[in-house]
């Protein structure tokens, strides 16, 4: 049977809209709880349909001890700080070249950013390919530890 008016439209303005006493529709208790309450109980059908991955573990988290954070330094920084490093005893001069051990400064890798005008003998655990190229271009040496 086709209804000419929907029930809600018929009940407009009637204070309780077909819910009986007004007190009966108050609060979250009549809605089955607030928010996601009852997701595994009275609202399970909704959870199963619209949020099936809500329960259980998903994915994989790499152990933090397996992740090694690389602390890089640029050639431009070493160029700028060369004189200061020699004064403080963290670097030394060997003829025309400046000898630097990057691990003493707390770095793990040498990157090639910036131009260098001096000859360096740098020892580090890692170098970028372009850093090795720049160092050797100036007559220096890149020593991998």
Curated annotation (Swiss-Prot):
Segments of skewed composition (Basic residues): 1-13
Gene3D superfamilies according to UniProt = 3.100.10.10, 4.10.990.10
An annotated GO cellular component of this protein is: cytosolic large ribosomal subunit
Alphabetically list the UniProt keywords: Ribonucleoprotein, Ribosomal protein, RNA-binding, rRNA-binding
Name the InterPro entries on file: Rbsml_uL15_N, Ribosomal_uL15, Ribosomal_uL15/eL18, Ribosomal_uL15/eL18_sf, Ribosomal_uL15_CS
- GO annotations under biological process? translation
Q: Which GO MF term does the entry hold, naming one?
A: rRNA binding
Which Pfam families would you find in this protein's record? Ribosomal_L27A
**Chain segments carrying region Disordered:** 1-44
PROSITE patterns, per database record: RIBOSOMAL_L15
Record SUPFAM superfamilies: Ribosomal proteins L15p and L18e (SSF52080)
The family classification in the record reads: Belongs to the universal ribosomal protein uL15 family.
PANTHER family named in the record:
60S RIBOSOMAL PROTEIN L27A (PTHR11721), LARGE RIBOSOMAL SUBUNIT PROTEIN UL15 (PTHR11721:SF3)
| Assembly and interaction partners | Part of the 50S ribosomal subunit.
> Function, please?
Binds to the 23S rRNA.
State what protein this is by name: Large ribosomal subunit protein uL15
Source organism per entry reads: Methanobrevibacter smithii (strain ATCC 35061 / DSM 861 / OCM 144 / PS)
Its organism's taxonomic lineage begins at: Archaea, Methanobacteriati, Methanobacteriota, Methanomada group, Methanobacteria
The gene for this chain is: rpl15
């Amino acid at each position: 049977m086709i209804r000419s008016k929907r029930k809600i439209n018929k009940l407009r303005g009637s204070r309780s809209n077909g819910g009986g006493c007004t007190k009966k529709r108050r609060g979250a208790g009549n809605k089955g709880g607030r928010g996601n309450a009852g997701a595994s109980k009275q609202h399970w059908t909704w959870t199963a349909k619209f949020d099936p991955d809500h329960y259980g573990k998903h994915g994989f988290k790499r152990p933090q001890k397996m992740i090694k954070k690389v602390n890089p330094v640029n050639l431009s920084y070493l160029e700028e700080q060369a004189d200061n490093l020699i004064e403080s005893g963290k670097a030394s001069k060997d003829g025309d070249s400046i000898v630097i051990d990057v691990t003493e400064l707390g770095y793990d890798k040498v990157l090639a950013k910036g131009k260098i005008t001096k000859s360096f003998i740098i020892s580090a655990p890692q170098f970028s390919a372009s850093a090795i190229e720049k160092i050797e271009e100036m007559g220096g040496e890149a020593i991998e530890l």
